[in-house]
Amino acid sequence: ALIDGDTKKIINIVKTGYAVHISRMSHSGRYLYVIGRDAQVNLIDLWMKKPDNVAVIKTGLEARSVDTSKYKGYEDKYAIAGTYWPPQYTIMNGDTLEPLKIVATRGYTVDTQEYHPEPRVASIVASHFKPEFVVNVKETGQTLMVDYSDINNLKVTTIGTERFLHDGGWDSSKRYFMVAANQRNTIAVVDAKDNKLVKLVTEGVGKIPHPGRGANFVDPKHGPVWATSHLGDDSVVLIGTD
């Protein structure tokens, strides 16, 4: 349901995929990209008199993540969706959702170097420092920096972070991506400017961290912090980001 922020009235009930998991605004603010757990991506035009779907695509059988390109000069040029099954991500035309490049995520685990045949794509965000998507692969524990500046000659930087990556969000500078490795009770900090792992935060992290995007605010004592809640306990942990 799309609700008018002023009148609080329902403007339209838009047909989407099953159990919408993620909603992402386009850089322009005109379009809303949503993905259901059934891997259906909907492109909704919010500037129409009655906002509704203008494009729909199924990228697989099960999915969790979608986003659009945000780097200067590439704003909304591309969209990306990551799927649980098949284990892959799909780069699409940002205006039409036409699939342009499909890449499998099968590979080796970061710790034991064992081959994993079906590692699921968890959270995806778009870098503000480079023309790259940050793609987190759950079972292998790899964070992929996918360079979309030339998708016909795709370049991917693979950062070994931690296994069982799930959701996460930017710190306040949008340089550092804070992603939960939930079954390892760890927060991995990835530098999206230098493309490297900065730190694995374990001290103080509770059981099964599940931040969503997390929350950034300035603590009066500790300064800038990023906060996460947990599925396995009732704690909220603050991580300093200055």
Model-assigned labels for residue ranges:
Residues 1-242:
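Predominantly soluble domains enriched in secretory-pathway, periplasmic, or organellar proteins
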